[in-house]
Amino acid sequence: MTQCYAEITGWGKCLPPATLSNHDLSTFLDTSDEWIQSRTGIEQRRISHVNTSDLATVAAQHAIACAGVSVEEIDLIIVATCSPDSLIPNIASRVQQNLGIPSAAAFDLNAACTGFLYGLETATRLMQASHYRHALVIGAERLSFYLDWTKRDTAVLFGDGAGAVVLSKTEQKVGLQDAQIGCDAQGRDILAVPKFGTAMDRFDADNGYWAFDFVGKEIFKRAVRGMGAAAQQVLARSGLSTEEIDVVIPHQANIRIIQTLCDLAGIAQDKAFVNIHRYGNTSAATVPIALCEALEQGKIKPHDDLLVAAFGAGLTWGAGHIRWGERITPLGKSDAQLPSCDHTALDLLSKAIEHCKRHQSE
């Protein structure tokens, strides 16, 4: 039986238009542009005026056009998200409905910030083992929904957005060649929204507020350790030296984590694609957005070897080796875009900010 692979043939992104700058944050938090940039590398982030599935749909439309396939050819949809519009049904079915895809398998996957890499591994192995020809893998988040806007440690970090890729079955040795994904469950409580779901008291009058637990120093240590070990395992199995890695697409959580990951892996920092300054941490969306922009900016060349690495709540972690194919430009383009937004980011967040302030004062 001929070995098959899953080539990335399409890529797309969706960033909501409303931008929340560090200066904007300083109008209601005890922080400053210098404080945020020096610790995270973030200058601004996007705040969505639409649901997560809307972001996912637009990113998917661009990826499908880029791949030059019709929606009828998509037979597998995986949406990686930890901020879905609804738990029942999944938002992959909403994306499928929005796109007019007739009967594809569609499901959500929650591995937090590592979700896209989990989804890429899952889709690739399903395509290799079964009949699927074209898969749509999306990372989409609206994390602004979760945040306590009185807590500086998390309010400055996260943003909203979506990225998507189309995978197409091929006999060429391209696409995700190897991946190492895992979870350090001993650290599951240091990055968590612990009472969102059936753990929540549904009759509590204060259901609009929930804790977002975040232990930054411990997260940093575990993130670097998990991603670094996974990257070393992937490189060893792929038979690649660090010099042979052309581009690193890391999870965009913190510029210091990206730099430390490269140092531990022995890879030059200038090989890492970085856009955290523009969007902050968009969780499962960071890797596909970064991949899309690396292609748009000409950072990825035909036949390049890419190292992808991520970590997230759980604490999930992972790394993967992607061998790029021949094509680095879109076959087609889509004019898909979000509905217009006449509000600033501060306008969109005004009720949430006031609610969080009231809760803190009680």
UniProtKB/Swiss-Prot annotation:
Subunit relationships: Homodimer.
Q: Which gene encodes it?
A: fabH2
- Main localization category: cytoplasm
At the top level, the lineage of the source is Bacteria
Catalysed reactions, semicolon-separated: malonyl-[ACP] + acetyl-CoA + H(+) = 3-oxobutanoyl-[ACP] + CO2 + CoA
The Swiss-Prot or TrEMBL record describes its family as follows: Belongs to the thiolase-like superfamily. FabH family.
Keyword presence, Lipid biosynthesis: yes
Task: Using the UniProt annotation, give all residue ranges assigned to the region (ACP-binding).
Answer: 252-256
Q: Which UniProt keywords apply?
A: Acyltransferase, Cytoplasm, Fatty acid biosynthesis, Fatty acid metabolism, Lipid biosynthesis, Lipid metabolism, Multifunctional enzyme, Transferase
Active site residues per record: 113, 251, 281
Per its record, how is this protein called by name?
Answer: Beta-ketoacyl-[acyl-carrier-protein] synthase III 2
- Keyword Lipid metabolism recorded: yes
- The coiled-coil regions, if any, are none
Q: Where in the cell is it found?
A: Cytoplasm
Q: Quote the Pfam families the UniProt record gives.
A: ACP_syn_III, ACP_syn_III_C
Q: Name one GO molecular function term.
A: beta-ketoacyl-acyl-carrier-protein synthase III activity
